[in-house]
């Protein structure tokens, strides 16, 4: 293997919500969250990484998505979501990252500055978001062709890095709650 992620020893469980063009529907994300919830114990799922966000979503649909991720959070999952790439304007964090409960990740560039496209808060409910930023520029990631890679940028690249760090944290202390994980991450960030 040429490349490996932040937590190369962790087991991944994938729930596909996008087609080969990168398009998806709200119903597919909601169905995936239900599947994860149902299979939590079978696969030992602790972390839900959601590297998609929806800017062009009506408020009713956004509320359904936020409700679903908050239900997952309330079940004890560590839910990590992308802030979206609609920044840098205030209030540009996309759903479900606008949820006050979940860990919302913005993107930083090669110079450790917040990326110009990274979603920014506060949310419509005056919640400070994102909770943290992680490298999201020029990341080598998998591509949609067999055994191929591509260089990508954005919060969809920074979010899995945080999820990987959380996997390592939970490996060290498996009894941490999602709230404790979020608190530890926020307290360890440099401003």
What kind of region is each of these model predictions?
Residues 1, 13-19, 92, 136-191:
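Hydrolase catalytic cores
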Residues 1-27, 43-46, 74, 98-101, ...:
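Subtilisin-like serine protease catalytic core
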Residues 31-34, 67-71, 103, 160-167, ...:
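Solvent-exposed, polar/charged alpha-helical surfaces in well-ordered, non-transmembrane soluble domains
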Residues 33-60, 82:
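Short acidic, glycine-rich surface-loop motifs adjacent to enzyme active sites
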Residues 40, 52, 56, 73, ...:
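Sec/Tat-exported extracytoplasmic proteins
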Residues 47, 78-80, 103:
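Short, Asp-centered acidic motifs that coordinate Mg2+ and/or phosphate
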Residues 61-79:
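Catalytic-core regions built around general acid/base machinery
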């Amino acid at each position: 293997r040429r490349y490996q992620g932040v937590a190369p020893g962790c087991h991944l469980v994938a729930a596909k919500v996008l087609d080969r063009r990168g398009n998806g529907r709200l119903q597919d994300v909601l169905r995936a969250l239900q599947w994860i919830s149902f299979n939590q114990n079978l696969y030992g799922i602790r972390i839900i990484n959601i590297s998609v966000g929806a800017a062009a979503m009506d408020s009713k649909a956004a509320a359904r998505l936020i409700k679903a991720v908050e239900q997952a959070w309330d079940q004890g999952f560590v839910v990590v979501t992308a802030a979206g790439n609609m920044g840098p304007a205030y209030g540009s964090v996309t759903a479900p990252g606008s949820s006050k409960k979940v860990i919302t990740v913005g993107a930083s560039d090669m110079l450790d500055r917040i990326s110009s496209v990274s979603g920014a808060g506060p949310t419509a409910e005056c919640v400070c978001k994102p909770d943290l930023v992680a490298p999201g520029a020029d990341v080598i990631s998998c591509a949609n062709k067999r055994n191929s890679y591509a260089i990508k940028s954005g919060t969809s690249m920074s979010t899995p890095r945080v999820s990987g760090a959380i996997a390592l944290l939970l490996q060290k202390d498996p009894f941490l709650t999602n709230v404790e994980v979020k608190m530890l991450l926020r307290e360890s960030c440099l401003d």
